[in-house]
Amino acid sequence: MAQKKKTKSAKAKPAKKAPAKKATKAKDIKYVYDFGKKTDGDAKQRELLGGKGANLAEMARIGLPVPPGFTISTEVCTYFYDNKKSYPKSLDAQIRQSVELMEKQLDKKLGDLEKPLLLSVRSGARDSMPGMMDTILNLGLNDQTVEALAKSSGNERFAWDCYRRFIQMYGDVVMGVQKLPSEDHDPFEEVIETFKAEIFPNAKGEVDDSKISASQMKELVHRFKSLVKKRSGKDFPICPWEQLEGSVGAVFGSWMNDRAIVYRRKYGIPAEWGTAVNVQAMVFGNTGKKSGSGVAFTRDPASGEKVLYGEFLTDAQGEDVVAGVRPPRPVAQLK
């Protein structure tokens, strides 16, 4: 009989496994987007950066002189409300890294006793919601850094004016020092008007805040801090990082304040969108009569005519324009 050839059975090769997808860890998620000399975002990212953050990034990207800063994304706002008003673990480190980048660009430092960096903290929803959420200016000031600002600017009154504005904004927005149902006026404004009546007893009509001297501003700061302590039971915070944390939380919190909710319902803006938070280096309009703040458009908003249109106030900060503290002047007068 013919012998059968022995055949070796080929062993089946194991199928190659598809490379496992790396799970995105919370620490890998980018929550903070810089703008300035280093810019992460652009105009297409309104959902993530909000309208203001996306536009700031786009302007910086095309080379316009945008003061440096960073945007905390709308994803953090969503996390904030989904997790009992807490933050992702990696957020603090990302914010500190972005602040350090600003410090290097400007040669200033948050809390520094020679060249302090001061910040603004603003909201930035996908669709504009003017005046509905909160803003804080001049963040970073305390009893020491205000002296440094006075020295570095050569303008003591300006420095103390910034400080009293910061205490008023932070006290209201973060610490809840607001008008009570039994009161007719904002408590900070009551303090200002009482103080002006003391120092200008013979004044006829309303006295403009610009008439208050540097030494008088110092006294006003003292009275503001006393008001904060009395109403909130807490001292005004002196640590700039504590101030920044409180301000960011307050801006996210303002997404759900009563006026923002009413506005969203009226204009069909979903609550799920959330708001971004924009942190930016301060530019000052209250250094004297040769500085100012205002609003400008490249076209007339009413007619669409291609003309520079807007209004401004001299020796003022942005909130003065919004609040209508005195009649603004048309931008056309600058020609």
Over which residues does each language-model region extend?
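Nucleotide/phosphate-binding sheet-loop regions of phosphoryl- and nucleotidyl-transfer enzymes
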Residues: 2-335
